[in-house]
Amino acid sequence: MKEPAHFVRRGLFNVLNGNISYDGSNVPVYNAVPNNATYPYIIIYSVSTNQIEDNISNYIADVSTRIEVVTRFADGDGGQLQANQIINSISQLVILKSGLMNLNSDGFNVYSQVNEGITYLTEDAPDHTYYRGIISLSVKLEQI
């Protein structure tokens, strides 16, 4: 079986990049956050790949991927709302019943993209407060 995690990340990147905005500005999407990143931003990373069914003809896997929104405010400024609204925009593009990612050219047929939960975290640093929204996404696919 081919390892599909990087194909899933690239597919999600292609779906989100240039398609998520906040207050009229594009929200950048990364798989590795550069030192000069501006806030808010989105990062996509793989968690695991598990073979979920073994039959005589196809490899079927569940790829667990996280899509994380990171926002930052000076202490006492801002809140979770920005992360909530960006997560809402992302959810409408990736948590679908039809129109799933097309990874056919990579040798995979995606048949399910399921929200496994959305987590919100707050981190207080000395000079800023960071709000993070994290979508845990299960992508089920078969190698074709």
Each language-model region and where it sits:
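Charged, amphipathic alpha-helical segments and their flanking helix caps
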Residues: M1-V27, V47-I144
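Short acidic low-complexity segments
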Residues: V29-T38
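A short, hydrophobic beta-strand-centered structural micro-motif
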Residues: T38-S48
